Amino acid sequence: MNGIQWIIDNKDTAWAGVDESLHGIDIISLSWGITSHEGGGSDGSDMHSMILDVAMEEGIVVSVAAGNDGPNNDGLSGMGSSDLSITVGATDDGNTITRDDDTIASYSSRGPRRDNGDGNPLNELKPEVTAPGTNIIQAEGCVTSGGCNNLLGGDASSNTYTSRGSGTSYAAPAVSGILALMIEANPNLTAFEMKEILKFTAERKGEPTQPDVDPFWNRDFGWGLVDAYEAVKLSIKLRDQGLNGLIDVNTQVHVESSSIDNQSGLYVIQGIAWGQMGSVNAIEYRINDGEWMSVAFEQTNGSLSALERFSWSLALDLDKISMANNSIEIRGLSDDGQSLPITITIQGYGGVSDSSESFIWDLLPNTMFFVLFIIVGLLLWNSRTENPEALFLDSNDSIAKVLKEDKDLASVVDAELLEG
């Protein structure tokens, strides 16, 4: 506790003899489990978990090992149960360089965390991510010849590597290394943006364990196996677009599939969206950094509540898009900011448009080459099934009126209400 408090107290300390960019402390990598002395493990209210929450809130991103109690573990220990920290499970890569055969390590503790009774099912979804933790070669820690005594302050410059080891204590430092790369790429990322980027870019593994709460989280892998390349790439994108501090980590927009529809010939991107703590106000897209195009919709029976999902589908006529790599960017908007952006690269068949604006003005009357459907899903975490809410344009007349009055919406040619 005192050690973590010292880190928090020195998060901005100007260390002597180093450049200002190296001042303070940015990351905690923790492989220390605390027995909670409770059946079912900790619910995150123990003092060790709570001080890690404070560290995250102070801007220090925390990577903490999930534990090594295997699939039948009795919950997670203190620290690994922290509401806000990044809890890390371990995978076994089978001694291959491919990721397809990676499995959850037999020893890796599984989720979820014990319920703390606060009515929010999201903070029980532990671990957040997984990383390689099996048969990992380790740096030599000894600083003297002979016995390994790890003298503090000793000269370890001649140390090499020693034996291999396994455990979530090897996975958590790997995630800490990725976090360091993300900070190097974008020093202005917040701790919560980094956590969300890791979850968002992770390679999905396993079937969803609690699909009514989250459609991707799995009790073994969390939101998936970390992808360092994609995490750093998205960090750079946020830097280049000036999005630091503008990301609402509770606004979720995800692509589920993208391919050419054989019947229509259109390139179709399908996905889902929802708010974890509120509602999604709009979904927008743009082409090649052009203007953002919004989707008009009306809401029935009030606003969508937290965790209520809807599906969206975007269809593009490739004949209207230039024969080059074109960037399609999609985002969701809420009262508190925007979701992490999704970028898909497609190649057109020969049009000359290179921006959202020119793409719109190529629209021909009565030609439906771009379609954006908004459909409310009936996936409610609180098991509500009556009177599902819908996003819709109520008639063809309404559509025509919208297109006439708002040219920014000219590419929206249809939307229909689906009743549950």
Predicted region positions:
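Subtilisin-like peptidase catalytic core
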Residues: 1-39, 89
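Extracellular S/T/G-rich loop segment that most often corresponds to the catalytic His/Ser-adjacent loop
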Residues: 14, 80-180, 184
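C-terminal subdomain of the subtilisin-like protease fold in secreted/lumenal serine endopeptidases
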Residues: 18, 25-29, 160, 184-260, ...
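Structural recognition of the beta-strand scaffold that forms the well-ordered cores
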Residues: 26-31, 53-56, 61-65, 86-89, ...
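Glycine-rich, charge-decorated loop segments at or immediately adjacent to ligand/cofactor-binding or catalytic sites
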Residues: 68-84
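Long, low-complexity serine/threonine/glycine- and acidic-rich segments characteristic of extracellular
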Residues: 247-359, 370
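Alpha-helical transmembrane segments
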Residues: 373-387
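Cytoplasmic C-terminal tails of single-pass
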Residues: 385-420
